[in-house]
Every structure is written in structure tokens, then in C-alpha cells.
């Protein structure tokens, strides 16, 4: 029951079968870009020479049009994002907390919790002072 299975096609046959499919994709790409494909040997062997050849005016303009279309579509997306929020919206929703003292602490709280507690208690006197000022102004405290 243990028969050795031989592959139905060899590796050389598989690579030969893939080649026409690759050439079709290559021709499609040239067709989309508007180029005339050269012989396959020119594509494979003379890549340095092709890079030195200048584009014709028609090829250059066609590529420039394609790039311009991409820029226009990406610019439209940015305009759509910007249109949702105007300058009036930004100012009406601001906190007006310009003078708030905010500190960002990064690190591992599990490694040295005492350091974080010290920083927290250092900030509390300022918060207590702000609370006293609010109460002395007669403002309502929403937490009461």
C-alpha cells in the first residue's frame, strides 16, 4: 500500500507553464501604462540601457496624468476629513484650560509605586487650592 507518488509534472514543466501567464500580466501592465513592450530579452538583459533611455513625450505625459489623478484623489480625501470641523467648532469646544498644569509620567508603576505616589501627592495641594478658590467664588461644585 505504500506506493511512491511521482509528481505529475516536473519543475521545468511547471516553470514553463507559468511563463506565458507571467507574460500576459506583463503585457497587461504595458497596455495599462500605454507602453509598447520590447522583446523579452530586452526586458531581462538590458535593464541598465533601458533606464538610461529618456521617455518619449507621450509616455511622459501619460505617466504624469496617472500620477496627477492619484494626487487629486488623495487631496479630495484630505478635504473631506477637514470639512467636518470648522474653526468655529474648534473654538467652541475648547476647554479654555490654558493655565492647567499637566504632567505626564511614564514608567512601570509596579516597579516603584512610591515614586508615583509622591508625584501624586505633590500635585494634590494645587488641586486643593483650586477647589478652595471655586468654593470661595460661590460656584456650585458638581461633586457635592
Curated annotation (Swiss-Prot):
The lineage of its organism: Eukaryota, Metazoa, Chordata, Craniata, Vertebrata. GO terms for biological process: adult behavior; fertilization; male gonad development. Residues 75-90 have a biased composition (Acidic residues). GO terms for cellular component: cytoplasm; male germ cell nucleus; nucleus. Testis. It comes from Mus musculus (Mouse). This is Testis-specific protein TSX. InterPro entries: TSX (IPR035352). May have an RNA/DNA binding role. Residues 1-21, 69-99, 120-144 are annotated as: Disordered. Pfam families: TSX (PF17397).
Amino acid at each position: 500500500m505504500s506506493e511512491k507518488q511521482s509528481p505529475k509534472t516536473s519543475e521545468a514543466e511547471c516553470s514553463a507553464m507559468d511563463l506565458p501567464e507571467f507574460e500576459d500580466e506583463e503585457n497587461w501592465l504595458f497596455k495599462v501604462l500605454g507602453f509598447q513592450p520590447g522583446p523579452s530579452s530586452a526586458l531581462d538583459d538590458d535593464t541598465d540601457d533601458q533606464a538610461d533611455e529618456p521617455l518619449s513625450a507621450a509616455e511622459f505625459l501619460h505617466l504624469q496624468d496617472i500620477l496627477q489623478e492619484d494626487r487629486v484623489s488623495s487631496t479630495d480625501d484630505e478635504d473631506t476629513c477637514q470639512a467636518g470641523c470648522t474653526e468655529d467648532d474648534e473654538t467652541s469646544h475648547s476647554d479654555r484650560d490654558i493655565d492647567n498644569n499637566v504632567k505626564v509620567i511614564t514608567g512601570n508603576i509596579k516597579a516603584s509605586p512610591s515614586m508615583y505616589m509622591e508625584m501624586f501627592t505633590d500635585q494634590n495641594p494645587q488641586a486643593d487650592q483650586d477647589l478652595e478658590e471655586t468654593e470661595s467664588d460661590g460656584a456650585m461644585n458638581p461633586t457635592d
